[in-house]
């Protein structure tokens, strides 16, 4: 693993901050100062920062069922609390954030982590990671309106809609590969419908547990994490 990445994972700082420590000569590998951020830390080598031995901590990966009324950002406002209020006491020293946003009046799956690279890849348009939603509308939607969803453009760019399947008269399962602000609501608004209920049920291969209640969370299994990384070709050893 590169030295700057090793420090980033050990100290939970940015790669930029890690490079600054290295450049200033505050980092030793096996007793010798190393000033190359790209230096590969080998198995068995000890890394020290200002005389203190450091080792990468295991990242946190959580599935959270975000309830309505909670922000998917780490900043709170006067009206709504952050999702962090639901998990903070269990991870007091971790800088956790959500991989992607979910409207404050929506509920469903939030992937919570401190793995910045994975979060970045899962939300980057390049990787086309699918997000699945259950959408209930203010009235029944017709087949022609459903077809028109595939033609909708926002800011002159087509919405990346993979599939829109009618589950009942007023309920649609929508799968998108993008996360623009209020994209689901704006998509349906473009064909004359208001969204009255929105729930995210899947991100990539990760599906919200059926027995999970709003506000509940669990850690992802090793296999679930591996599958997410495989989906976006993320090899943390690089």
Swiss-Prot record:
Source taxon at top rank: Bacteria
InterPro entries on file: PsdUridine_s_RsuA/RluB/E/F_cat (IPR042092), PsdUridine_synth_cat_dom_sf (IPR020103), PsdUridine_synth_RsuA/RluA (IPR006145), PsdUridine_synth_RsuA/RluB/E/F (IPR000748), PsdUridine_synth_RsuA/RluB_CS (IPR018496), RsuA_PseudoU_synthase (IPR050343), S4_RNA-bd (IPR002942), S4_RNA-bd_sf (IPR036986)
Keywords of the record: Isomerase, RNA-binding
Enzyme class: isomerase
CDD domains in alphabetical order: S4 (cd00165)
Location of the active site: 103 (nucleophile)
E.C. designation(s): 5.4.99.-
Pfam family of the protein (one): S4
GO MF annotations in UniProt: RNA binding; rRNA pseudouridine synthase activity
Gene Ontology process terms (BP): enzyme-directed rRNA pseudouridine synthesis
Every S4 RNA-binding domain range: 1-64
Gene3D superfamilies hit by this protein: Alpha-L RNA-binding motif, Pseudouridine synthase I, catalytic domain, N-terminal subdomain, RNA-binding S4 domain
Catalyzed chemical reaction(s): a uridine in RNA = a pseudouridine in RNA
Similarity annotation: Belongs to the pseudouridine synthase RsuA family.
PANTHER family membership: PSEUDOURIDINE SYNTHASE, PSEUDOURIDINE SYNTHASE FAMILY PROTEIN-RELATED
Descriptive protein name: Uncharacterized RNA pseudouridine synthase aq_554
Species in which this protein is naturally found: Aquifex aeolicus (strain VF5)
